[in-house]
Amino acid sequence: MSYVPIVIEPTSRGERAYDIYSRLLKERIIFVCSTVEDHMANLIVAQLLFLEAENPKKDIYMYINSPGGVVTAGLAIYDTMQYIKPKVATLCIGQACSMGSLLLCGGEKGMRYSLPHSRIMIHQPSGGYKGQATDIEIHAQETLKIKRLLNELYSKHTEQELQHIEKSMERDNFMSPEEAKKFGLVDNIISSRDVMALLAK
């Protein structure tokens, strides 16, 4: 069982306890800090919708430290980021791999950041299926459709030619923050909050 720190704050009615993630949510900070799967994706989507309802004009900050995961779960988060009214700034801490890298580059243009020693990785989707030959063929065709979709999304957000994206994603493609910036996955590399505040002006 993982331990989640509790923050205790004084209020006019006594003390109030929050888990650390709920407290950060009050500051409009969302953490994507594990494998992307359906349950966590639903929680992230709910947080995005809640923050939009609370203030549709105020920016949201998404911190990403994820090895990636299920494509459909990641696309649920991605689509919600594009759907809501607030701008979503993204920041890679540690790693943003596979679907994590799509969420990173899917942030608001000019507000996609990486810390200096993060790693970013893109690649084509993978899948495995057992069953009848016809069913295997159906799933293979679906995987190819998803591959084309992801290539188009990366092309859109990096502003690179689709052919270059396809070639770059054929195998696991690890990048430093500098390489990710050159590729178009992030806009800036930041080493301190002061730098981020300066860039936001």
Swiss-Prot record:
Domain of life: Bacteria
Keywords: Cytoplasm, Hydrolase, Protease, Serine protease
Residues forming the catalytic site: S98, H123
Sample GO molecular function, one term: serine-type endopeptidase activity
GO CC terms, sorted: cytoplasm; endopeptidase Clp complex
CDD domains membership: S14_ClpP_2
Family: Belongs to the peptidase S14 family.
Enzyme class: hydrolase
HAMAP family for the chain: ClpP (MF_00444)
Species of provenance: Rickettsia rickettsii (strain Sheila Smith)
Source lineage: Bacteria, Pseudomonadati, Pseudomonadota, Alphaproteobacteria, Rickettsiales
Catalysed conversion reaction: Hydrolysis of proteins to small peptides in the presence of ATP and magnesium. alpha-casein is the usual test substrate. In the absence of ATP, only oligopeptides shorter than five residues are hydrolyzed (such as succinyl-Leu-Tyr-|-NHMec, and Leu-Tyr-Leu-|-Tyr-Trp, in which cleavage of the -Tyr-|-Leu- and -Tyr-|-Trp bonds also occurs)
Entry protein name: ATP-dependent Clp protease proteolytic subunit
TM region(s), chain numbering: none
Coiled coil: none
Gene3D superfamilies the record matches: 2-enoyl-CoA Hydratase, Chain A, domain 1
Task of the protein: Cleaves peptides in various proteins in a process that requires ATP hydrolysis. Has a chymotrypsin-like activity. Plays a major role in the degradation of misfolded proteins.
BP GO terms, sorted: protein quality control for misfolded or incompletely synthesized proteins
Assembly notes: Fourteen ClpP subunits assemble into 2 heptameric rings which stack back to back to give a disk-like structure with a central cavity, resembling the structure of eukaryotic proteasomes.
InterPro entries referenced in this protein's UniProt entry, alphabetically: ClpP, ClpP/crotonase-like_dom_sf, ClpP/TepA, ClpP_His_AS, ClpP_Ser_AS
Localization, UniProt: Cytoplasm
SUPFAM superfamilies: ClpP/crotonase (SSF52096)
EC annotation from Swiss-Prot or TrEMBL: 3.4.21.92
